C-alpha cells in the first residue's frame, strides 16, 4: 500500500481509492503532498502566494521561498547551502520563470533529488515540485579512490556479467554523488558505460568512493525493440540536398540539419564506438536523381523530419535540445540487428531479423518515441527506474502516438510482420498485450527496473482517456482532444517534471500545466483529474 499525506484547502478527512491513501488537513495558504518515505513535500501548490520582498532579484525571492519551507523540508541552515539552480527557463506565454534545482550536500549533488519551482512575473512562487531529502548527517565528501579507479571497477564488473568488452561506446566518466540507498548514504562515483556488444546497454554503476565496491548497477538504455509490420512501401516526400547533379539525404532547412546515413551493416559495437569518439555516421546516401531506393533510409529521413516538424509546429521546440541540434540517423546498423535506439549522439536503426522485426526506421511512432527520450533527457531528466522510469517510457509513447496520430497503437507498422493488427503497445487498451491499465494492478517487482515498460501502460491509459474520454473503472472522463492533451503533457514535461517525479506527482504536474494553459477550474483541468482518477492515480 502506498501512503501519502496531503494538505488541502478544501477538506479534512481520509479517503481511499485503489491502493492509495491520502490524509488531508485544512490550510488556507497552500496544498502540499508529502512523500511517504521522507515525509517532506513532493509538491506545494500556493493558494495565496507569499508577497515578495521589494527590490529583490528572482533568485533572491526563490531562495527566500525555500528558506520559508526549510522546516517542512527537514533541512538545517540556509537554503542556498542545500539547493543549486541548474537551469532557468523563461516562459513567454505566461511570463513565468521556471527554476530547475538540484539538492546538494556539502556541494555534492544527492542522486535523484531534483526540483522545479514556478515563479510568477511579480516574483511570487506559484508551485514547487520534486522530492526533497531531509538533512543528511556526517557523510564525508572526500573520495578515497580516484575516478579512474572507479571506471576500471565498473568495467571489470560489467565484463564479469556480459563478457569481454572489446570497445566502449564513448569515453566513460565518473561523477560524484551522495547516493541514498537502503537507509545508507554513500559518497559514490556514478560511472556510465555504453556498449553495443556483447550486449547493448547504457550501464550505470555506483562505485563507493571510499572502498571501491559496487553499491548498485542497472542498465538504462532507451530502445524500441520490436514494433510494427515493417517498412510499408508507401511513397514519402522529404527534403534533400542537391549538389553538382547528385542528391543527398541531407536536409539543411530544419534546425542545424537532419542527415541520414548508411552503416553498411557495420558491427553495431564498432559503429557506435566510432560514432561516439570521432563522430562517424556511416556512408552518405547518394542518388543520381531525386528518387531514393533505400526504403529504410527513406523512412528514417522522412520520419525524423516529421518528428522535428511535430515538435516545432506543435510546441515551438527547435529539435530535441531546443537549440536546433542536428538530428542524425544511421540505418543498416549491424546484421539483422533487432533494435533501434537513441545513443546520446544520434539515432541508430537495425534491419531486424525479418521475423520478429523489419527495419525499425519504418515506424513513425518508434522514431518519435526515441527522439522524445532525447527531449526528456534535455528537459526533465527522468530517472530510468520505478515510476519515474515508467513515466519516461510513457511520455515517449504518448508523444509517439501524437506524432503518428492515426491510432493509439505503438509500433504497429514494423512489429511481427505477417500478423495483422499486431502492435507493441496500445494506449487505448493496454490489456491487449497483457499490461496493466489501473494502479491497483501495477507491477511491484524488481524486473525491468521496477516495471518501467510494464507500468508505463497505466499512465498511457490515463493519457488516452484524457484525449478521447470514456468510462474506466466506473469513472466517467470527458475527453478534451489530442490537441489540448499534448499541450498539457509537453508543458508538464518541460516545466514541472523532475528526475524523481512519480505517478502522483505527474498527475499534479499535469493539473498545473492545464491550469497554466486553460485556467484554474477549466474543463481541461477537471478532465485531467478524472483521467488519473480513472486509472487509480490520486
UniProtKB/Swiss-Prot annotation:
CDD domains: M4_TLP (cd09597)
UniProt binding sites for Zn(2+): 369, 373, 393
Gene Ontology terms describing biological process: proteolysis
pH dependence (record): Optimum pH is 6.6.
First-tier enzyme category under EC: hydrolase
Listed EC numbers: 3.4.24.-
Free-text disruption phenotype from the record: Cells lacking this gene grow normally in both LB and SG media, and no difference in sporulation frequency can be observed.
Reported cofactor(s): Zn(2+)
Residue ranges of the propeptide: 29-223
Residue span of region Disordered: 421-441
Signal peptide boundaries: 1-28
Catalytic center residues: 370, 453 (proton donor)
Protein name as catalogued: Neutral protease B
Annotated source species: Bacillus subtilis (strain 168)
Amino acid at each position: 500500500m502506498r501512503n501519502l499525506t496531503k494538505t488541502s484547502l478544501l477538506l479534512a478527512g481520509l479517503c481511499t481509492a485503489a491502493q492509495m491513501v491520502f490524509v488531508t488537513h485544512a490550510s488556507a495558504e497552500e496544498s502540499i503532498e508529502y512523500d511517504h518515505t521522507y515525509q517532506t513535500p513532493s509538491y506545494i501548490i500556493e493558494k495565496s502566494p507569499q508577497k515578495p520582498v521589494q527590490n529583490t532579484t528572482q533568485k533572491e525571492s526563490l531562495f527566500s521561498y525555500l528558506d520559508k519551507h526549510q522546516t517542512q523540508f527537514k533541512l538545517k541552515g540556509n537554503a542556498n547551502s542545500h539547493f543549486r539552480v541548474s537551469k532557468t527557463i523563461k516562459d513567454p506565454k505566461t511570463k513565468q520563470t521556471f527554476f530547475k534545482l538540484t539538492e546538494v550536500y556539502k556541494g555534492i549533488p544527492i542522486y535523484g533529488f531534483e526540483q522545479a519551482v514556478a515563479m510568477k512575473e511579480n516574483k511570487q512562487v506559484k508551485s514547487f515540485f520534486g522530492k526533497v531529502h531531509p538533512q543528511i548527517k556526517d557523510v564525508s565528501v572526500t573520495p578515497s579512490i580516484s575516478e579512474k579507479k572507479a571506471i576500471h571497477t565498473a568495467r571489470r564488473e560489467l565484463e564479469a556479467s556480459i563478457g569481454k568488452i572489446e570497445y566502449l561506446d564513448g569515453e566513460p566518466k565518473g561523477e560524484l554523488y551522495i547516493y541514498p540507498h537502503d537507509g545508507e548514504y554513500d559518497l559514490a562515483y556514478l560511472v556510465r558505460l555504453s556498449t553495443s556488444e556483447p550486449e547493448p546497454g547504457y550501464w550505470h554503476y555506483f562505485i563507493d568512493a571510499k572502498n571501491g565496491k559496487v553499491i548498485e548497477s542497472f542498465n538504462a538504455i532507451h530502445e524500441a525493440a520490436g514494433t510494427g509490420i515493417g517498412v510499408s512501401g508507401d511513397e514519402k516526400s522529404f527534403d534533400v540536398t542537391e549538389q553538382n547533379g547528385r542528391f543527398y539525404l541531407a536536409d539543411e532547412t530544419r534546425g542545424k540539419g537532419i542527415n541520414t546515413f548508411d552503416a553498411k551493416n557495420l558491427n553495431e559495437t564498432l559503429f557506435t564506438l566510432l560514432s561516439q569518439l570521432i563522430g562517424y555516421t556511416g556512408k552518405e546516401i547518394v542518388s543520381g536523381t531525386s528518387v531514393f531506393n533505400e526504403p529504410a533510409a527513406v523512412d528514417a529521413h522522412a520520419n525524423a523530419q516529421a518528428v522535428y516538424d511535430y515538435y516545432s509546429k506543435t510546441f515551438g521546440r527547435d529539435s530535441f535540445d531546443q537549440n536546433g541540434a542536428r538530428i542524425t540517423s544511421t540505418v543498416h546498423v549491424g546484421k539483422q540487428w533487432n533494435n533501434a535506439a537513441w545513443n546520446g549522439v544520434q539515432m541508430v536503426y537495425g534491419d531486424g531479423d525479418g521475423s520478429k522485426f523489419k527495419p525499425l526506421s519504418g515506424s513513425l511512432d518508434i522514431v518519435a518515441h526515441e527522439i522524445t527520450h532525447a527531449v526528456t533527457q534535455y528537459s526533465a531528466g527522468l530517472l530510468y527506474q520505478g515510476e519515474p522510469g515508467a513515466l519516461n517510457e510513457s511520455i515517449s509513447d504518448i508523444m509517439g502516438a501524437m506524432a503518428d496520430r492515426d491510432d493509439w497503437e505503438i509500433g504497429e507498422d514494423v512489429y511481427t510482420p505477417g500478423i495483422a493488427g499486431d502492435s507493441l503497445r496500445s494506449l487505448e487498451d493496454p490489456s491487449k498485450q497483457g499490461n496493466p491499465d489501473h494502479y491497483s494492478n501495477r507491477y511491484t517487482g524488481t524486473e525491468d527496473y521496477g516495471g518501467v515498460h510494464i507500468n508505463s501502460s497505466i499512465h498511457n491509459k490515463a493519457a488516452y482517456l484524457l484525449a478521447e474520454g470514456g468510462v474506466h473503472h466506473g469513472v466517467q472522463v470527458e475527453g478534451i482532444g489530442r490537441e489540448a492533451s499534448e499541450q498539457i503533457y509537453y508543458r508538464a514535461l518541460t516545466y514541472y517534471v523532475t528526475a524523481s517525479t512519480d505517478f502522483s506527482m505527474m498527475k499534479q504536474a499535469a493539473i498545473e500545466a492545464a491550469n497554466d494553459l486553460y485556467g484554474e477550474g477549466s474543463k481541461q483541468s477537471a478532465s485531467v483529474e478524472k483521467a488519473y482518477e480513472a486509472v487509480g492515480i490520486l
